[in-house]
């Protein structure tokens, strides 16, 4: 700044001398006139006037300069006061800024901790949201698959319905034909009904007869089993009897063999006796002893071969031969031996004949029983065949009843298919309702999450406003910074 406060001099400005500008053409004219007329007096007068005007102008300029100086001093004083006020306000603002900066740092630390917690909560919420999204996606996938299955089932049900409708149409046509033919064949139907009643009565009678025949068949089966057991027992007895006959035959053969052996021995003894006939009187005792020893040997051999036979005396036949050839003086003894031999042989023959007759009678009885049992078995077989014929007739009646029941069964099947179709439709509707409910729940969950986030942000804002009373400018700056942080946080997420 200069002496005049930085203001330019008024002498250098043309707008402070308007009269000079206005009179400049006149000066030029006067100069021309001076050159032309060379009127010096006029020039002098004009110069005097100019001097007067310059003096007046200088005086005005001095007054104007004084006013400007006063204005300058006032402005400098005002500027000084303003600068002092500004410096004081600047110092106060610096102190406030330091206090607010410390508060802001504390708030920033709190906000960072809150932001970390909010990030953790947001991560948890996002993980839960992803989990819910996966669950909702899986549920939607399951619902879509179930919907697809239901659509396929519905298509199948529609196909079945079409088939059943066609079948129902054919059945209705058949029913119509039957109703038409029923009017034509009403007498036949009445007769068939009467025949059916008779057949039902016969059926009941046949069922009762069948039941009786079954009972009889059971009894006959039991009798047949007992008869088979009796046949087996008789066959076993027959085998035992045959074995006994074979044993008796063997015993008889052994007796014949022993008899031949004894005959040979007797023959040898007879030869010896013929040779010693002359010495019979002297050796009679010896001959008797030999006979006794021979009879004892024969008896011992017979006992050893057949222990079951009764004890018999020495063979009368041998004694007879021996007595005939050796002792003529002992006629009484030989007669006694002949009588004993005859009686003994007769007893043996009678016993063998009785045993043979008994066995023959037993075999005959067994044969008769076997024949009776065979006849009974044949009768039972005939009865079973007759029962088979009755069962065939019964089966025919049952087939007719089954054919009559088919129509009702088909109608029941059609009604069941209709019910299944209705149930499938209801299931489809319930599935669609569940899908809509799940979508509504998902939207409600998203809205709840948004509300929770907004509530947390509002609570943080309320805490900040309660902690620090702020000016509008600072609150606006903080709001902008906070919104910038929130937006940057969501961008980072």
From Swiss-Prot:
GO cellular component, one term: cytoplasm
GO BP term, pick one: vesicle transport along microtubule
UniProt keyword annotation of Cell inner membrane present: no
Coiled-coil portions: 56-275, 365-431
Keyword rRNA-binding listed: no
InterPro entries on file: Spindly/BICDR_Dynein_Adapter
Domain of life: Eukaryota
Signal peptide start and end residues: none
Key words of the record: Coiled coil
The family this protein is said to belong to: Belongs to the BICDR family.
This protein's name: BICD family-like cargo adapter 2
Species annotation: Xenopus laevis (African clawed frog)
High-level lineage: Eukaryota, Metazoa, Chordata, Craniata, Vertebrata
């Amino acid at each position: 700044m200069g002496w005049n406060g930085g203001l330019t001099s008024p002498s250098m400005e043309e707008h402070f001398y308007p009269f000079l500008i206005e009179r400049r053409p006149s000066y030029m004219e006067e100069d021309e006139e001076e050159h032309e007329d060379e009127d010096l007096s006029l020039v002098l007068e004009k110069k005097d006037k100019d001097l007067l005007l310059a003096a007046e102008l200088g005086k005005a300029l001095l007054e104007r300069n004084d006013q400007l100086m006063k204005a300058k001093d006032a402005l400098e004083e005002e500027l000084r006061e303003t600068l002092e006020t500004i410096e004081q306000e600047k110092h106060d603002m610096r102190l406030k800024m330091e206090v607010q900066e410390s508060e802001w740092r504390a708030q920033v630390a709190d906000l960072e901790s809150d932001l970390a917690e909010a990030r953790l909560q947001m991560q948890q919420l996002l993980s839960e949201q992803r989990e819910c999204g996966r669950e909702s996606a899986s549920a939607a996938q399951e619902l879509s698959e179930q919907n697809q299955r239901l659509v396929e089932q519905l298509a199948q049900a529609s196909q079945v319905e079409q088939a059943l409708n066609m079948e129902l149409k054919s059945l209705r046509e058949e029913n119509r034909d039957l109703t038409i033919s029923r009017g034509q064949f009403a007498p036949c139907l009445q007769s068939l009904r009467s025949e059916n009643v008779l057949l039902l009565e016969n059926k009941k009678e046949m069922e009762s007869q069948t039941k009786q025949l079954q009972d009889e068949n059971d009894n006959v089966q039991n009798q047949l089993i007992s008869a088979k057991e009796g046949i087996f027992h008789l066959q076993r007895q027959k085998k035992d009897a045959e074995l006994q006959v074979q044993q008796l035959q063997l015993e008889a053969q052994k007796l014949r063999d022993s008899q031949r052996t004894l005959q040979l021995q007797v023959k040898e003894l007879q030869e010896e006796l013929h040779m010693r006939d002359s010495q019979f009187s002297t050796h009679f005792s010896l001959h008797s002893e030999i006979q006794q020893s021979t009879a004892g040997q024969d008896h011992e051999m017979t006992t050893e071969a057949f222990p079951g036979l009764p004890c018999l005396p020495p063979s009368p036949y041998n004694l007879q031969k021996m007595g005939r050839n050796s002792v003529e003086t002992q006629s009484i003894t030989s007669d006694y031996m002949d009588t004993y031999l005859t009686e003994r042989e007769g007893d043996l023959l009678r016993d063998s004949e009785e045993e043979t007759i008994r066995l023959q009678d037993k075999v005959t009885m067994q044969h008769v029983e076997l024949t009776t049992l065979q006849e009974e078995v044949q009768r039972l077989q005939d009865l079973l065949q007759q029962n088979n014929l009755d069962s065939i007739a019964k089966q025919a009646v049952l087939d007719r009843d089954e054919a009559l029941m088919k129509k009702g069964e088909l109608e029941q099947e059609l009604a069941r298919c209709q019910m299944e179709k209705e149930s499938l439709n209801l299931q489809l509707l319930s599935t669609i309702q569940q899908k809509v409910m799940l979508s509504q729940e998902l939207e409600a969950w998203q809205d709840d999450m948004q509300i929770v986030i907004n509530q947390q942000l509002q609570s943080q804002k309320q805490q900040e406003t309660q902690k620090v009373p702020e000016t509008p400018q600072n609150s606006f700056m903080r709001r902008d910074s906070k919104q910038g942080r929130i937006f940057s946080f969501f961008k980072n997420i």
